[in-house]
């Protein structure tokens, strides 16, 4: 086969033109489309990568916030638990304190009621004993008993000290002194109309029953020895006296009787009961204040 050079050149030129045409009108759009697609994919991948990074950052922030929230929740839960526990303890202590105060108040009230009842029983018992004693003495009072009372009165006068004798003398003559030697001797207000116009002191001695002459003489002697002066005596009977003797002189009266003992005993018992009641009330107030 003969090779024509022109034909070869023409074929080569034709081939080159075909290649250029293919590249210009066929391959270039395809390549451009491929490049554009590749660029779009790369852009989308870059955007996706950015979004992924943002998502990871957001996830990290979310997890961090969750951790912080959990920590704050634990702290708040611990704080609230401690506060609730402390409040519960405070309320329990307050309840126990209130219960103790109520119990103490109830016990004190019961103790006061018991003490009041006990004091009332004591007072009633003492009053009954004293009343019975007075009644018995009034029923048993007689001449023999009056003689013994006179002897007791004489012994008491003879055992007075100098100061007591001086006080008794002043009480009988001038009046106005306080009785400090015995609860059985009582100085009463002046009795109007007693005295002697002759200047000699007159002493009136009275008892529930008439005293024998011997007892009258003994009393007169003891009183003269006590007063150290001349006096006159009038002895009389006073039915209202219970086992006792009273002397009236210089406008004053000095009395000695078993009734005086009973009155002193009653006064002492009343004083002791009042003092005991005041002590109990003071202790109750101190306990309440301490609470």
Curated annotation (Swiss-Prot):
It is a single-pass membrane protein. CDD domains: ATP-synt_Fo_b. Keywords: ATP synthesis, Cell inner membrane, Cell membrane, CF(0), Hydrogen ion transport, Ion transport, Membrane, Transmembrane, Transmembrane helix, Transport. GO terms for cellular component: plasma membrane; proton-transporting ATP synthase complex. F-type ATPases have 2 components, F(1) - the catalytic core - and F(0) - the membrane proton channel. F(1) has five subunits: alpha(3), beta(3), gamma(1), delta(1), epsilon(1). F(0) has three main subunits: a(1), b(2) and c(10-14). The alpha and beta chains form an alternating ring which encloses part of the gamma chain. F(1) is attached to F(0) by a central stalk formed by the gamma and epsilon chains, while a peripheral stalk is formed by the delta and b chains. F(1)F(0) ATP synthase produces ATP from ADP in the presence of a proton or sodium gradient. F-type ATPases consist of two structural domains, F(1) containing the extramembraneous catalytic core and F(0) containing the membrane proton channel, linked together by a central stalk and a peripheral stalk. During catalysis, ATP synthesis in the catalytic domain of F(1) is coupled via a rotary mechanism of the central stalk subunits to proton translocation. HAMAP family: ATP_synth_b_bprime. This is ATP synthase subunit b 2. It comes from Nitrosospira multiformis (strain ATCC 25196 / NCIMB 11849 / C 71).
């Amino acid at each position: 086969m003969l090779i024509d050079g022109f034909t070869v050149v023409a074929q080569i030129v034709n081939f080159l033109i075909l290649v250029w045409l293919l590249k210009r009108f066929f391959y270039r759009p395809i390549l451009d489309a491929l490049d554009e697609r590749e660029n779009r994919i790369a852009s989308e991948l870059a955007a996706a990568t950015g979004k992924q990074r943002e998502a990871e950052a957001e996830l990290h922030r979310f997890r961090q916030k969750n951790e912080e929230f959990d920590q704050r929740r634990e702290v708040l839960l611990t704080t609230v638990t401690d506060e609730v526990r402390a409040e519960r303890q405070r309320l329990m202590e307050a309840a126990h304190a209130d219960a103790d105060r109520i119990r103490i108040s109830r016990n004190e009230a019961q103790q006061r009621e018991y003490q009041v009842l006990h004091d009332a029983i004591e007072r009633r018992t003492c009053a009954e004993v004293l009343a019975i004693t007075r009644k018995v003495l009034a029923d048993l009072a007689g001449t023999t008993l009056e003689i013994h009372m006179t002897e007791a009165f004489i012994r008491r006068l003879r055992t007075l000290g100098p100061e007591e004798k001086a006080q008794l003398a002043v009480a009988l003559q001038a009046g106005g002194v306080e009785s400090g030697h015995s609860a059985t001797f009582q100085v009463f207000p002046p009795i109007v109309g007693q005295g002697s116009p002759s200047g000699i002191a007159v002493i009136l001695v009275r008892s529930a029953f008439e005293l024998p002459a011997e007892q009258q003489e003994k009393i007169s002697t003891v009183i003269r020895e006590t007063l150290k002066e001349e006096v006159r005596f009038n002895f009389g009977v006073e039915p209202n006296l219970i086992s006792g003797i009273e002397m009236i002189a210089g406008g004053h009266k000095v009395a000695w009787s078993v009734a005086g003992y009973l009155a002193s005993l009653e006064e002492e018992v009343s004083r002791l009961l009042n003092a005991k009641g005041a002590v109990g009330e003071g202790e109750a107030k101190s306990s309440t204040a301490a609470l």
